[in-house]
Amino acid sequence: MRASVLSTLCAIGLALAAPAWAQELKVGDQAPNFKLQASDGKTYQLSDFKGKQAVVLAWFPAAFTRGCTIECKSLAEHGDQIKKYDVTYFMASVDPIEGEKGNKAFAEAHKADFPLLSDPTKETAKAYGVLNERGFANRWTFYIGKDGTITYIDKDVNAHLDTSAEYMAGKLGELKVAQRKTP
C-alpha cells in the first residue's frame, strides 16, 4: 500500500514537472521577449531589436561577486571586439537596479559601457530557464538572431570568464552575425 501511494505521488510529480522540461529553450526557438530596466536608466525590450539587430543576453548570478566581476570587466575592457558586429549585448541578473549591490552600481564600478539589465521579479530569468534553485540566474549566454530566434546558448561561460569579450566576438563571427558598417 505504502509503495503504491509513493508510486502514485511520484507519477503526479513527474506529470506536473513535465511541462517545465518541455519548455527548455533550445537553438531555433523564439527567444522570450523581455522588458527590463537597465543600468543606463533606459528600459529595453527584445522586441525593439527584432528585424534590426542581433542581441546577446549574458545572464550572471549576482553583482559584485568574483566571477561576475571578471566577466563584466572583460566585456567592459574588450567590448570593442564585440562592437565590430551589428549586435546589442547585455549582461542580466535578478539583482535590483538600484542600491549599493544593484546593477547600476556594479556597472559604474567596472566602467561598463553596455547596459546591465535587472530582473528583480525573476520572470524573465524563468522564461529563459536560467533561474536556479537558490533563486539566482545561471551564468548562461543567449545569442539571438535579428529574427528573434536563439542561434546559440553558451552554458559553459565559466570556462572563459576572463576572456568573455573575445569569446563572444569569436562566437558572433562563427554565427555569421553581420559586421557593423563603418562610415
Residue ranges and their predicted role:
Residues 1-7:
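Positively charged n-region of N-terminal signal peptides that target proteins for export
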Residues 7-17:
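Bacterial N-terminal signal peptides
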Residues 21-47, 170:
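N-terminal "domain-start" segment that seeds a small globular fold
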Residues 35, 90, 103-139, 145:
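Short, internal strand/loop/helix patches
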Residues 45-69, 73:
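Short active-site neighborhood of thiol/selenol oxidoreductases, capturing the structured segment around
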Residues 47-49, 130, 156:
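Residue-level structural signal for beta-strand termini and adjacent loop
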Residues 69-110, 122-126:
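Structural microenvironment flanking redox-active thiols in thiol-disulfide oxidoreductases
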